């Protein structure tokens, strides 16, 4: 049913998203869900893309929104592409334009088209500095002092960049309340600001396999500074004598693939399988009882929410601010003090050996995952859209 919320000047409100490679990654996957939800609620939705990767859509996905091309290439905000975006916004009568990248020509585009622009940050605020913070903690004392000086310079540079985005954005979306609080504090924003919480959505499976196998799962990219899968291998070395009938499956890929396999050989790890990357994650969630993460930092990890939706109990380090939004009680996962590998190993063994506890937590994490439904996420987007449209009507 058409309402004032999805009408503008007697036509459907048109919301467009910008993407370089689509769909490719967590932000684009959420865009698919949000785009379909907005279409089903009476909005016109278009995704403008440079490279349309149709083979990357989830199996069985029915797309309701339009996808229209931009000039192909690798830089979304070159002068040539910026002009193409301007022309597309005017031609398609776009009311709200959503971007996940800090756009060089955003202010120019707004001036030329009058479009409302929404920036959505799909990482923690100032995530660009997290890897440097980790490197400082691991560095030799002399090198650490040099890195600390460099970090102060980088801090100031990125604060200016974030302030610039906040200045041109009509709305600034973040993934959870703790990210909003952090951004508000670090940028010294007023309490009534443009930052809004637009949480990730996770498709809820229609069938959840509760008959799990004795499998512990890692699923994600191989990226040393952030993911630290080497920690998981050392933890597995500790626990494998105590869990002889359990298996560790590592699903994913990246530049560390060869070195991690070599490390597993050096540690003489047993009952471990490197499965490689895959788009068919459901088959792994269906079998696994426990999900392991050993990251130094994360944003709002979709893999954690997907595991919960499929009844896989997570265990991970309490190493990033959004973790308590996903694991908000002891029944929704196991949090370990960073980065105590002995404590992690002890907790993992205890969880693996306690069938009754895992079964109880399995049901609880499935319930928790319902809070990530597209209806909840869509409602947050609808509230943001209403606010932006009402500013024009007011």
Task: For the regions a language model picked out, list residue spans one by one.
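Membrane-proximal helix-turn-helix segments that form the acceptor-binding/catalytic region
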Residues: 83-87, 139-172
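Short His-centered aromatic/hydrophobic patch
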Residues: 99-105, 121-124
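A short, well-ordered alpha-helix in the C-terminal region of glycosyltransferases
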Residues: 343, 350, 357-371, 379-383
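Conserved acidic donor-binding segment of nucleotide-sugar-dependent glycosyltransferases
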Residues: 317-318, 329-341, 350-355
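A conserved mid-protein helix/loop that constitutes part of the nucleotide-sugar donor-binding site
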Residues: 28-33, 214, 223-238, 255-261, ...
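Aromatic "clamp/platform" in nucleotide-sugar-dependent glycosyltransferases that forms part
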Residues: 277, 296
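N-terminal strand-loop element at the rim of the active site
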Residues: 10-12, 17-25, 31, 37-76, ...
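Carbohydrate-associated surface elements
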Residues: 178, 201
């Amino acid at each position: 049913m058409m309402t004032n919320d999805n009408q503008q000047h007697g036509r459907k409100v048109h919301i467009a998203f910008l993407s370089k490679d689509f769909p490719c990654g967590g932000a684009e996957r959420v865009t698919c869900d949000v785009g379909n939800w907005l279409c089903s609620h009476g909005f016109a939705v278009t995704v403008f893309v440079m490279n349309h990767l149709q083979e990357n859509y989830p199996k069985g996905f029915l797309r309701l929104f339009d996808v229209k091309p931009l000039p192909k290439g690798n830089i979304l905000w070159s002068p040539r592409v910026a002009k193409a975006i301007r022309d597309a916004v005017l031609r398609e009568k776009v009311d709200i334009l959503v971007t996940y990248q800090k756009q060089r020509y955003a202010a120019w585009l707004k001036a030329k088209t009058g479009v409302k622009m929404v920036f959505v940050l799909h990482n923690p605020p100032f995530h660009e500095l997290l890897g440097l913070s980790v490197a400082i903690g691991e560095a030799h004392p002399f090198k650490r002092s040099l890195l600390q000086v460099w970090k102060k310079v980088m801090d100031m540079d990125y604060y200016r960049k974030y302030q610039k985005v906040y200045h041109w954005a009509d709305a600034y979306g973040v993934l959870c309340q703790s990210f909003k609080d952090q951004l508000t504090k670090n940028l010294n924003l007023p309490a009534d600001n443009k930052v809004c919480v637009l949480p990730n959505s996770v498709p809820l499976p229609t069938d959840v396999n509760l008959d799990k196998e004795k499998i512990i799962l890692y699923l994600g990219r191989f990226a040393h500074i952030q993911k630290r899968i080497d920690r998981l291998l050392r933890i597995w070395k500790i626990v494998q004598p105590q869990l002889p009938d359990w298996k560790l499956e590592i699903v994913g890929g990246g530049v560390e693939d060869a070195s991690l396999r070599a490390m597993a050989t050096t540690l003489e790890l047993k009952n471990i399988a490197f499965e490689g990357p895959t788009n068919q994650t459901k088959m792994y969630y269906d079998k696994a009882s426990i999900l392991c993460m050993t990251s130094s930092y994360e944003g709002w990890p979709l893999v954690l929410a997907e595991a919960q939706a499929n009844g896989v109990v997570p265990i991970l380090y309490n190493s990033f601010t959004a973790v308590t939004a996903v694991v908000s009680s002891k029944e929704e996962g196991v949090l370990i003090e960073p980065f105590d590998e002995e404590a992690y190993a002890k907790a993992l063994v205890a969880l693996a050996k306690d069938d009754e506890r895992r079964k109880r937590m399995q049901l609880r994490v499935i319930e928790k995952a319902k809070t990530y439904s597209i209806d909840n996420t869509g409602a947050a987007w609808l509230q943001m859209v209403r606010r932006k449209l009402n500013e024009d009507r007011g």
